[in-house]
């Protein structure tokens, strides 16, 4: 899912969507082999799930970097330019190298062995990342699934050290499956023989059963983040101390460190990350003080688009909640942090999401008004007129509508009172233009 600058991957050469066009994984395995098997030059931590993948990936990357490793990070979706989706130690792939790798892939696809073959833009981005990470000799790659699972481009890698599953819920219904069991079954196929498989805490019983059975069939070690307990103590509005206790087999780890990521859901993601971290430390005989590593890597980590504060006056927060579970987590966080503040919510969804359920959840937020807009995705955007009709159905109110996300946020800023919290929530295709506008505006104003 490419969401930033698009010109580098011409749509005619790299179609948007080929997910259901034949044996995509078999094709990508052949391409990787022809490219010299770059995916086998480093150890892979593969992350799959419905919500929380990006945050989990960034936390793990930050920890590995703090431990002294050279770390590749592949994320989808991402915020900003196309290069943001491929990073080493949190630095984007240079545009020149990106273009070089595109040329390598194009040249290969022109050979007789791959005559008349096309790869999608997401598949191309994945292949570029593998070439780049191998060339730059990274130690580890944190690899985030796209749609996720059996037919996801990232599943073409030969082997992985870890398969990590964040919360699995209903999303991409009809593509991944029609219920939790079917979706979890599709996602479980990233598990590799003899690797370590980790599941998020509070995973549904249906998903948990599927993941555990697949891990057993692959003779993988299976770890559940339910064995990590986290409590917090607030130091300030923005900062908190995390107190954790992890039961690992017959041993126990406990400690405290600063953790500033907002969002109650980030504590669930953190439990998953801690489960991985303590297993990883055990397997690599790491000797440094663990709480120091956690504090230095996670204390000031920012995850773009995940309850991210991008402006203080007025306060503007961006969150990529775009399915029922994501919206529930967003609502819970807003109610906890801003229970009484006036709230102005800029909202837009893709038409293939369960947007009516999401609207009903958003309407539970007290002291809220709404501005309706649409994501920047011509194929999948839900028109603001249709979304406004859903709001009207449940409130009998007509909220302002804008086809342009940037015009929507401008209107929000213009009408907000000094105490209003502006919350932008919905598709990452909505957040991307708004975030770009706000950051460029901030730079222009010298903030």
Which stretches of residues belong to each language-model region?
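Short functional linear segments
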Residues: 1-49, 56-69, 74, 110-117
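ATP-dependent carboxylate-amine ligase catalytic core
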Residues: 32, 37-40, 66-158, 176
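Hydrophobic alpha-helical packing residues
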Residues: 60-65, 133, 391, 438
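Beta-strand->loop->alpha-helix junctions that form or flank phosphate-binding loops
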Residues: 74, 200-202, 214-236, 259-264, ...
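Acidic, Mg2+-coordinating active-site environments of NTP-dependent enzymes
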Residues: 112, 136-144, 160-256, 270, ...
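Nucleotide phosphate-binding/pyrophosphate-handling subdomain across enzymes
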Residues: 140-143, 151-164, 168-172, 182, ...
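C-terminal helical cap/extension that packs against the catalytic core
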Residues: 202-223, 315-316, 324, 359-421
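Active-site-proximal loop/hinge segments that shape catalytic or ion-binding/gating pockets
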Residues: 427
